[in-house]
Amino acid sequence: MIKLELTNYDIFPKVFPCDKETEVTIKPLGAHAAFEGEYTVNVRAFNEGNAARYPERNNLVQYSVTPDTDGHIRFTHTYIDEQEHYVDIIKDGKRVVRLSVYSLLPDLAGRYPFRGDLHMHTCRSDGNQAPAIVAAEYRKNGYDFLAITDHDSYYPSLEAINAYKDVPIEYNLVTGEEVHLEGNDIHIVNFGGKYSVNALMPGDHHMDVGDGKDLRSIDGECPDVISVEEYKKQVNYLAKNLNIPDGIEKFTYASCVWIFNHIKKADGLGILHIPTGFRMFFMCPKA
């Protein structure tokens, strides 16, 4: 859910190292939200509990502030530990806005937080809108990256990427697909792979627009198509040579390994998608 407070005010920096004195700026986004006169800034550490119920934790620090000449409010505070902190702006005893900032330990403090979706369908499988429209809707709602991962199909992710290839926006559209192969009920997401795993075998479900390598890969480079019989032969060979626990379906297990191996070879990330069931009832036993 998008914070409506951020349509009227911006606060920055939003992420910074913990246990260090940090200056934070609050900027009104328009004349309707302008600061006038004197305010109180209340800072509370989220993990320390309600200040009224746990007063011994001293989880309420207050600052009296007035806007600078540019209309922004600035104050300096030491944010303890790795956690979220509430920043409340109070005027005449009433809260004007509550904003959040985040203090982090060194391992995360130098990184950027990004918002994205690793698995999304379009009308090319069981979604409702075209890939380009789905991508636009995600960007409109503040997402930084998106992988379109339609059932059996890799080319819809390329369709979205090509739709915006000449648009100068900081938006990372990633290749992807939802892989489900014959003899295996387990669906696996191929996130960011350079080529399609589904399209390693023939089938109308992913070749309805053609079977060229430009539709099966991001750079025109991918393995040749093999027959279903060859796929099963390779999976059965894996099943004989893997250390598969008793009670586990050997072909299913080996097929998953085969899929993950290809995703890794394609420099992608393999993600188990709903590994135990779908369609409102359980289909796959626990591995």
Please state what every model-predicted region is.
Residues 107-273, 277-284:
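A metal-dependent hydrolase metal-coordination microenvironment
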Residues 2-69, 75-183:
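An N-terminally biased module of ancient metal coordination in phosphate/nucleic-acid-related enzymes
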